């Protein structure tokens, strides 16, 4: 993607990320969603939400209020599955490899009801681009 650095959106329920993490460098506007109130710092805005009461809805509403209309989600299985289950996605890039892993975390599960789907092969990897119905 070309253009300016995107606004970083971080979920840190208990503010457990190390203070020396790059996300705290202040170089890029950053929103941190947390349960703990915290004063703003240079380019860092802390947004307090209740993680026990539909946190994704609160996050999406807070981003909408700040006129953010596009969100690229990178995360682990639980976060990605939550976005999928709550139908909070329009398109997805899925990378698959034919190699079998015998342990680890399973990938998020999606149904196959896509309005649009492309599959491309790169050496041993398969890339899927899909849009939701």
Regions found by a protein language model. Give the residues of each.
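Enzymes that bind and transform nitrogen-containing heteroaromatic metabolites
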Residues: 1-133
